[in-house]
């Protein structure tokens, strides 16, 4: 019969393999086969079937009710003595989505000199190319050591800031106590998720609720994998683009107008209309409600005004909105009227009726309400730089 084994090691790494055995195969011999596949010593193996721990090593698999196609869970025991040199497990890893850190060094003793020698090697051999894991020396369970390692590696620090903002914020706060609290909380949360997942794998395969949870977990894993592939292959898709603004003038007052071909009409804020001295021309019979992502009240409409773009004076009408963060938005009515085209290759707006071109504004010249990098992001980048520099000075 074919038995599928789902293995979970002490460091939370996982493996799945299948074994072809007979029903009268003893449990102790089955553990020996599992040791060869999982690299977990037979004396540390626990086999679970249908939420029941198989204890008697001399009993056959058939006596426990195992049959062809069944799935069992292999768990590695905790709190065991030192291992033989030839049975050292794989190096544990830190998952930056959950920061799962292996157990303390009490279960696997290691000399300080060995730890110092292995730390740089582990960091060099296990990069964060995928943004998921990084190699950590055996027994690295101290929040202080983890904090020092992250602060000394700018690449890992930037990935941590992107993948795990709460832990990155605690790291950059400069408080070891805060970092330890956040780290331990995420460890506990990750352990609870692992326990729930093990419970699902050992549940009744005919249970609809368990199958629905397994389906949801597989879906989340596919989403994470899709995101990681996108980060590797198309990182530009995670960036933000600057909005299209141009310089113009209305009634002699300089403005920055947002070019939006998806907007039906050209609009202006009430505050901007007051600065341009055109509120006296507002026809309040055209009052209403503008609906889009949200809703805003339309005070009225200015039927005819002049807008200056470069050297051209163009006729335009405005709908005046009561509470609008941007001064003016050039909608499709104005763009079609003057046969405007958006040339993204040249980064210009072309006025079709006159042939005039005006460049779109760079991010530094955009209004504050439309800049994609705010002060908080800039300060976070500065904090990372200062933390890395401080860490380097302390080491020297």
Curated annotation (Swiss-Prot):
CDD domains named in the record: RP_DDI (cd05479), Ubl_Ddi1_like (cd01796)
Top-level class of the enzyme under EC nomenclature: hydrolase
InterPro entries tied to this protein: DDI1_N, Peptidase_aspartic_DDI1-type, Peptidase_aspartic_dom_sf, Ubiquitin-like_dom, Ubiquitin-like_domsf
Pfam families in the record: Asp_protease (PF09668), Ddi2_HDD (PF24669), ubiquitin (PF00240)
Keywords, alphabetical: Aspartyl protease, Hydrolase, Protease
Location of the Ubiquitin-like domain: 1-81
EC number: 3.4.23.-
Annotated segments matching region Disordered: 82-139, 376-396
SUPFAM superfamilies noted in UniProt: Acid proteases, Ubiquitin-like
Annotated GO biological process: cellular response to hydroxyurea; proteasomal protein catabolic process; regulation of DNA stability; regulation of protein stability
Active site: 260
GO molecular function, one term: aspartic-type endopeptidase activity
Bias (Polar residues) ranges: 103-122
Function per UniProt: Probable aspartic protease. Seems to act as a proteasomal shuttle which links the proteasome and replication fork proteins like RTF2. Required, with DDI2, for cellular survival following replication stress. Together or redudantly with DDI2, removes RTF2 from stalled forks to allow cell cycle progression after replication stress and maintains genome integrity.
Similarity comment text for this entry: Belongs to the DDI1 family.
Protein name: Protein DDI1 homolog 1
Organism: Macaca fascicularis
Source organism phylogeny: Eukaryota, Metazoa, Chordata, Craniata, Vertebrata
């Amino acid at each position: 019969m074919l038995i599928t084994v789902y293995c979970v090691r002490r460091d939370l790494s996982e493996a799945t393999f299948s074994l072809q055995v007979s029903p009268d195969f003893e449990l102790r011999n089955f553990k020996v086969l599992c040791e060869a596949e999982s690299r977990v010593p037979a004396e540390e193996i626990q086999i679970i079937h249908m939420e029941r721990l198989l204890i008697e090593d001399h009993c056959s698999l058939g006596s426990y009710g195992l049959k062809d196609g069944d799935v069992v869970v292999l768990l590695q025991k905790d709190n065991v003595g030192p291992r033989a040199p030839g049975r050292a497990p794989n190096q544990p890893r830190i998952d930056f989505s959950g920061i799962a850190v292996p157990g303390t060094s009490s279960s696997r003793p290691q000399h300080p000199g060995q730890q110092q020698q292995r730390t740089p090697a582990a960091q060099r051999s296990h990069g964060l190319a995928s943004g998921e894991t990084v190699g950590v020396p055996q027994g690295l369970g101290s929040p202080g050591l983890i904090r020092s390692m992250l602060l000394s590696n700018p690449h890992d620090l930037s990935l941590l800031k992107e993948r795990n903002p709460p832990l990155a914020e605690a790291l950059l706060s400069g408080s070891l106590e805060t970092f330890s609290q956040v780290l331990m909380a995420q460890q506990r949360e990750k352990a609870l998720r692992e326990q729930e997942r093990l419970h699902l794998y050992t549940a009744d395969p005919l249970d609809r609720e368990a199958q629905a949870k397994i389906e949801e977990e597989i879906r989340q894993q596919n989403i994470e994998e899709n995101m990681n592939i996108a980060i590797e292959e198309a990182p530009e898709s995670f960036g933000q683009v600057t909005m299209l603004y141009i310089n113009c003038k209305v009634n002699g007052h300089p403005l920055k107008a947002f070019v939006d071909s998806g907007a039906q009409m050209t609009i202006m804020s009430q505050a901007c209309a007051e600065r341009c001295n055109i509120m006296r021309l507002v026809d309040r019979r055209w009052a209403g409600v503008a609906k889009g992502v949200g809703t805003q009240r339309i005070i009225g409409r200015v039927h005819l005004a002049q807008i200056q773009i470069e050297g051209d004076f163009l006729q335009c009408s405005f709908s005046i909105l009561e509470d609008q963060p941007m001064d003016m938005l050039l909608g499709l009515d104005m763009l079609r009227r003057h046969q405007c085209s958006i040339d993204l290759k040249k980064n210009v707006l072309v006025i079709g009726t006159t042939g005039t071109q005006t460049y779109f504004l760079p991010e530094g010249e955009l209004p504050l309400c439309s800049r994609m990098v705010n002060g908080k992001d800039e300060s976070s980048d500065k904090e990372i730089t200062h933390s890395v520099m401080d860490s380097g000075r302390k080491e020297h």
